Amino acid sequence: MPHQQLLMLFGLLPVATNISTWWNFGSMLLACSALQVLTGFFLAVHYTANINLAFSSIIHITRDVPYGWLMQNIHAIGASMFFICIYIHIARGLYYGSYLNKETWLSGTTLLIMLMATAFFGYVLPWGQMSFWAATVITNLLTAIPYLGTTMTTCLWGGFAINDPTLTRFFALHFILPFGIISLSSLHVLLLHEVGSSNPLGTNSDIEKIPFHPYHTYKDFFMLAAMITTLMLIVSFFPDIFNDPDNFSKANPLVTPQHIKPEWYFLFAYGILRSIPNKLGGALALALSIAILLTVPFTHTSNLRSMMFRPLMQLMFWTFAATFLVITWTATKPVEPPFTTISQVAASMYFLFFISNPIMGWMENKITXT
């Protein structure tokens, strides 16, 4: 009986009638999370966290382990799918004013930070050339923190340079953090269902609601099928599309790659870091590029929730989206003109969106005299 009651509760979950496809990405993220944990477990069974054996163990997984190539590719490309879904999920939250549900937004931003940390630790594990140098550059930023920086870096490295203890630490962190992500995701969903989802109009959803099942379950399954089909097509036909050519070589501390860069989903933050010619300033800008999302619920001044009826903010939002892509593109280029200038302008415009948000809201209120 209890499970029947649970199913009944799930089926009768009241949801706004007019929520669009942009609201499907939450369930897609849940599927991505499950897929990553499952494939990650099978990879961890065969992986060896040792600087002399890590690279060979990845080759062993892809060549010798039955369906190891499939597990490895699903895990690597699944991470990219995860970030595509999460960036769309955040963009939808910004566009439709979902951030006004403060607790849900703050728990979601914390989830993003935890997810980025997990992905970064995972990128280092194959111990390829780019993995090693990306780890060296990014972890070295901790030394910019006054007083505690050097101690924190030494603690994270497990010595005075990146070595075997570093890889062991990163593997342990990459294994344990997903459990934190699962816990925080549960809290995120719990907080969301305290007040319920918003809708594209930004109005009170209580006026007209429908049961979650069957209307939204079918819609969710359709989007999940589309996502898994896309994932399997990339895994089957373009498995190396997101990989860096340098990462097919074993880590060599004596040879620096011509251009050090992290995975594509971190390039916007890395581009902001590189646009500032100062170590501490760059590290602060990097942290702020994510942390600034925490300020959004507190800087909303407009009387309207959704951007659907705010043409000025729509213009700002799409400029922000274009800026995000421009920073991602410039971060793949060498540190030389004109890329440095483009990167600096784009980074300024990135932060300008968050600064102009309250000003635009105040202006709109004045114009509409509401």
From Swiss-Prot:
It comes from Epicrates cenchria. Keywords: Electron transport, Heme, Iron, Membrane, Metal-binding, Mitochondrion, Mitochondrion inner membrane, Respiratory chain, Transmembrane, Transmembrane helix, Transport, Ubiquinone. InterPro entries: Cyt_b/b6_C (IPR005798), Cyt_b/b6_C_sf (IPR036150), Cyt_b/b6_N (IPR005797), Cytb/b6-like_sf (IPR027387), Cytochrome_b (IPR030689), Cytochrome_b_C_euk/bac (IPR048260), Cytochrome_b_N_euk/bac (IPR048259), Di-haem_cyt_TM (IPR016174). GO terms for molecular function: metal ion binding; ubiquinol-cytochrome-c reductase activity. This is Cytochrome b. Heme b b566 binds at residues 89, 188. GO terms for biological process: mitochondrial electron transport, ubiquinol to cytochrome c. Component of the ubiquinol-cytochrome c reductase complex (complex III or cytochrome b-c1 complex) that is part of the mitochondrial respiratory chain. The b-c1 complex mediates electron transfer from ubiquinol to cytochrome c. Contributes to the generation of a proton gradient across the mitochondrial membrane that is then used for ATP synthesis. Heme b b562 binds at residues 75, 174. CDD domains: cytochrome_b_C (cd00290), Cytochrome_b_N (cd00284). It is a multi-pass membrane protein. GO terms for cellular component: mitochondrial inner membrane; respiratory chain complex III. Its cofactor is heme b. It is found in: Mitochondrion inner membrane. The chain crosses the membrane at residues 25-45, 69-90, 105-125, 170-190, 218-238, 280-300, 312-332, 339-358. Binds 2 heme b groups non-covalently. It holds the Pfam family Cytochrome_B. The lineage of its organism: Eukaryota, Metazoa, Chordata, Craniata, Vertebrata. SUPFAM superfamilies: a domain/subunit of cytochrome bc1 complex (Ubiquinol-cytochrome c reductase), Transmembrane di-heme cytochromes. The cytochrome bc1 complex contains 3 respiratory subunits (MT-CYB, CYC1 and UQCRFS1), 2 core proteins (UQCRC1 and UQCRC2) and probably 6 low-molecular weight proteins. Heme 1 (or BL or b562) is low-potential and absorbs at about 562 nm, and heme 2 (or BH or b566) is high-potential and absorbs at about 566 nm. A ubiquinone binds at residue 193.
